[in-house]
Every structure is written in C-alpha cells, then in structure tokens.
Amino acid sequence: MIYTVTFNPAIDYVVRLDRPLEVGEVNRAAGEDCVLGGKGINVSGVLRELGCESVALGFVAGETGAWLERGLAAQGLRTDFIHLAEGMTRINVKIKAGTETELNGAGPSIPESAMQQLEAQLDTLQPDDILILAGSIPKSLSQSTYERLLAGLEGHGVRAVVDATQDLLINVLPYHPFLIKPNDHELGEIVGRELKTDAEITAAARALQEKGARNVLVSMAGNGALLVDEHGEVHRIGCPKGKVVNSVGAGDSMVAGFVAGYLQSGSYEQALRLGTACGSATAFSLGLATKEKIAELMQEI
C-alpha cells in the first residue's frame, strides 16, 4: 500500500479577476473555484488517476477539515486523517489577476499527542509499503519531524519517498530513503554550487547517494529530468512539448508517476517516463494531471 502524509492540508479558494487587483478597493471576481490540496494529497490524487490505491494521512481540524475530508471522499480518495480538537484546517486565498497574489492560512497547531497518533498509524505499515513525505513542516512541529518518523520506521522495510528541501532533505539521508526528488536548483543549494550540466547534476546526485539516498530524481523544469538509480545507472529524459499554464502540483505529480511506474513495471526507466509525463500533464493543465492527459503525453516521451 502507498501512504501519503500531508501535515497541513488546505482548501485553496482561487479567485480569478479580469482586471488587475486594486488594493484597498472592492474587486469583483470573474470566476472562482475551491481546490482541496496539500502536497501529499496531490500525490494521492494523481495516483488515483493512474489506478494506484493510496491512503492519505495527516491532520485536519474544525468545519473546514470536515469539509475537506468529505470532498476528498467524493473524489474517491481514501483518507485516515487525525482530527485535532482545536483550530481549523487552513484556507488559502489565491487571486489570479494577471499576476498571482496569495494569502495562505497558518493551519492548526499540532500537539505532541497527535504526532504520537500519527506514529502509531505508521507503526502498522508493512514491509514494502511506500510512505511519501512531501513539503514543509508546520511551525508547531519540530523541523526534525521527518527524521523522527523515518527513525521510527527503521527495520520495518518501508520504502520512504521524501520530497523536501535543504535540511529537511539532508537530515533524512542516513535513514536511506527509497527516493528523494530535489529539483536542480535545490540540489545546487544542498551541495553549495550552481549546477549547469548533466555531469554536474549527476555528481551532486551521487554525493547524496553516498550520504544514504537510494534513488535520486532531479527535476529540471523544461529541461526534463535526470535519475541516478540505486544500481548506479543514470537515466536522462526530456520533456514533451506543451504550454506551461500551471506550476502547482507538478512536482507532486512527478512523484506519483514515478512511484506508480516503478510499482507497475519494476523498471526505473519506465518510472522516470511516467513521472515525467505526469509532471508535464499537470504543468500543461489548469488542475492536476488526468489519466487522459498522461496517456497522451506518454506517447511523446
């Protein structure tokens, strides 16, 4: 089974204006949507499109949390959220008016007792289950939370996927995550230098493998992606052609595609192809990748 963790889910209230935003004035919306999200939830959504079942874990609170939970169930996603006694699941306001303005909610405070509940859930995972940790850590939790969770899973045979940046990523490497997915700029920040060539990116990825990562997947936006797998093989792929209209969730979609591709084929090359198709499908769409768009782009890769 695949499990995703979203520490701070959100309801994104997206407002579209047909003219520039006027601060301090009444602005009339030309359109609006509510999108249920968070990085782990995004991964679960794309996995569903690919026919892979997953369970979305994390924390919800208040009426907004109940609304988010019902909405995800209506989309066909399995969830097993921990319900917090205080606070509310956050609402992010995103105003699209030529440029995009965001007002992101803080989300509820997560007490130690809730973290212990999450650890109890993870303690039931079986060998070869996949656990996907993605995104930042809420302020109410320690920045060592990822390390804490992976340390608790040592010896369980669980395959961990971590999509995070800087210290959050570096500090989990001793726990030998199955997959990490920095982009080329994030990888450069980790190794302390700008990475301009495939050879430089490959060398930096191998350096993270030496610290413990099994597979290193590096996304490079319009330049495609590069994978250094656990056998030392380097796989390079370009991007299909298309107009980028959305950056939200593209990385999450790539993670979902890679995991699904590997589980379905056992091939890292196929995993990279499907991951790239999924990331591109989201980038070329107003929402997350659909199975139809993914299938279309797979023909081009």
Write out the residue ranges for each language-model feature.
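Conserved N-terminal subdomain of the carbohydrate kinase-like
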Residues: 23-25, 49-129, 298-301
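Conserved phosphate-binding/catalytic region of the ribokinase-like
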Residues: 170, 198-301
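Conserved phosphate/ATP/ADP-binding segment of small-molecule kinases
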Residues: 144-231
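Hydrophobic anchor at the start of a short beta-strand
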Residues: 2, 52-54, 79-80, 160, ...
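Glycine-rich phosphate/adenosyl-contacting loop at the front of the ribokinase-like
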Residues: 1-57, 65-67
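Short beta-strands and strand-loop turn motifs
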Residues: 102-104, 129-135, 163, 181-186
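Short, small-residue-enriched loops and turns at beta-alpha junctions
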Residues: 108-111, 137-141, 168-170, 189, ...
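Gly/Ala-rich phosphate-binding loop of Rossmann-like dinucleotide-binding domains
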Residues: 48, 154, 263
